Amino acid sequence: MKKDGKECLVGGPWLMALPLTGGGCYPNHNANTPIFNDLCTEWTVSSTEARTEGEDVCITVQGSYKEFKGNYTLRINASGEIAVSYTFEALQDVNPRQWGLVFEAPASFDRTFWRRDGLWTVYPEDHISRPVGEAALFYTGLPETIHPRVKPSWAWSRDFNELGSNDFRSTRRNIWYAGLKNEDGNTVTAVSEGHQHWRSWLQQDRIRFLVADFVTPGDEMFLSSYYAPYRKPLKTGESIGGTVKLVVGESNTTQE
């Protein structure tokens, strides 16, 4: 999708229903943990329908993944606003860590910004959970290799892997808005009401972002009973869904 002739969205929507994974508590001193960030697989379209409703264009797509079947509808207007409503039925049992829709932006959209409902009233300025902020895909001035016996002189939030800095790729829960922007001030913004969640990362030569309707903590075995009320295991035949609202254009959000 282009805004004033400039690409802002180049892919999606794709369904993500990332399974909750865990295991025994074993020592592992290898920092090269494999990335687990998969979309649903084997998408096949069964039908498409395009229509106009007033000044809006609506496109409904029916299809199936290996893991889910269902549909989504895109409603697009001339102001650069997109609403994507989706509903999918599970084709197999899954205990999800996160589920929602994933979109893709050009690599130049390498800063993320957000406003969200925080759990606490005060956060350190460089904390990944701060309620209002902006984060870079990668921060400058960091060494490529780090010695385990040397104390870092920078915040942990600036550490990075191939997906980006910790600050850029962390999940922001309960957003009012969150988005990406490039150096020219062009933005892609997810607008919510404090109940959806945002995560962005580098995917090869593009930036991807997830707008999630469900997130839960990781599979930490010692806290399994505490986290149990926050899990939502899905049985075959159960459905997930939601509506993602995106605004494409120049930045008009303020961070107070």
Task: For the regions a language model picked out, list residue spans one by one.
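Beta-strand/loop-rich accessory regions of lumenal/periplasmic or secreted enzymes
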Residues: M1-E256
